[in-house]
Amino acid sequence: MGSATPPRLQKFPATAPADDIYAAFKQDGCVIIEGFVPPDQMARFSQEIQPAMEKIQVQVTNDGNSNDRVKRFSKLVTTSPTFRHEILENDLMHELLQRVFSKPGEGLGYHFNDTMVIEVQPGAPAQRLHRDQELYPWWNSMGPNAPECLVNFFCAVTPFTAENGATRLVPGSNRWPELTLINAAECPQYGNIESAPAIMQPGDCYMMSGKVIHGAGHNATLSDQRRALAFSTIRRELRPVQAFPLWIPMKIARELSPRTQAMFGFRSSTQHCDVDTVHFWGNDGKDIGEHLGLMSSA
């Protein structure tokens, strides 16, 4: 919505109390966390995925497609040891997600929807403004007070600047009275939306609600390849974009911690109902991890 002053993104160091970061997330729907991934981890991760990134051909479509001059790569857990053994073991990420999705005594209330590297090439146009929860179209209709369905952690692998396509965020758009699609026909604020660029250094990230309006900015540079690492997480009741257990080899799955195995669908989550305990993604009422022969997480 139009305002007298440009919107401002709240920022916290990764050492700040999780409750403070979560409060800012609840208020604005997005918050920048500085130093979320240690720079040395991010540098090693970037080196490990570089050969795969170099094999991806850049598409130039000039048709408004979100892949126009953008590289995307999702096979991170099978490509990068740093990703699966270090970056995914981020305790702050889980502290925040527990506050968003989980109930006491019920384990993880969430799992990964997708994990992806997104690299915006020089000359790439600005992305269409959107809400990520449009993946589940009915969620917008439930309005701003509905539970979160999706939370993104979007990490800078290379510097994010206003010039090279830093994501444009609209803080507070998670609380707009109507969560409509962002287009001329359905959004009363269309053409009058003020956004702020997420300026970040490698290792910084923004945590974002699926309700928040955002879009990659235009990369107006001649040589900057703006590289990001995105974790998309969803409620355990929802189906993810990536069929992780069908393409992650068991050899890799066995290397993961029990918590990360659950995030990728190799373990069940539980919910306590009035008369019983239900295993989501289970096997005959038991943890799917037992069927797969994974060691006990107890």
From Swiss-Prot:
Binding-site positions, Fe cation: H130, D132, H214
Enzyme Commission numbers on file: 1.14.11.-
Protein task: Multifunctional dioxygenase; part of the gene cluster that mediates the biosynthesis of calidodehydroaustin, a fungal meroterpenoid. The first step of the pathway is the synthesis of 3,5-dimethylorsellinic acid by the polyketide synthase ausA. 3,5-dimethylorsellinic acid is then prenylated by the polyprenyl transferase ausN. Further epoxidation by the FAD-dependent monooxygenase ausM and cyclization by the probable terpene cyclase ausL lead to the formation of protoaustinoid A.
Pathway in which this enzyme or protein is active: Secondary metabolite biosynthesis; terpenoid biosynthesis
Pfam families linked to this entry: PhyH
Required co-factors: Fe cation
Lineage: Eukaryota, Fungi, Dikarya, Ascomycota, Pezizomycotina
Organism annotation: Aspergillus calidoustus
Stated family: Belongs to the PhyH family.
Subunit structure: Homodimer.
Entry keyword annotation includes Repressor: no
Extra information: In A.calidoustus, the austinoid gene cluster lies on a contiguous DNA region, while clusters from E.nidulans and P.brasilianum are split in their respective genomes. Genetic rearrangements provoked variability among the clusters and E.nidulans produces the least number of austionoid derivatives with the end products austinol and dehydroaustinol, while P.brasilianum can produce until acetoxydehydroaustin, and A.calidoustus produces the highest number of identified derivatives.
Reaction(s) this enzyme catalyzes, per UniProt: preaustinoid A1 + 2-oxoglutarate + O2 = preaustinoid A2 + succinate + CO2 + H2O; preaustinoid A2 + 2-oxoglutarate + O2 = preaustinoid A3 + succinate + CO2 + H2O; berkeleyone A + 2-oxoglutarate + O2 = preaustinoid A + succinate + CO2 + H2O
Gene Ontology MF term list: dioxygenase activity; metal ion binding
Gene: ausE
SUPFAM superfamilies tied to this protein: Clavaminate synthase-like
Site (Important for reaction specificity): L150, S232
GO biological process: terpenoid biosynthetic process
Protein name: Multifunctional dioxygenase ausE
Stretch forming the signal peptide: none
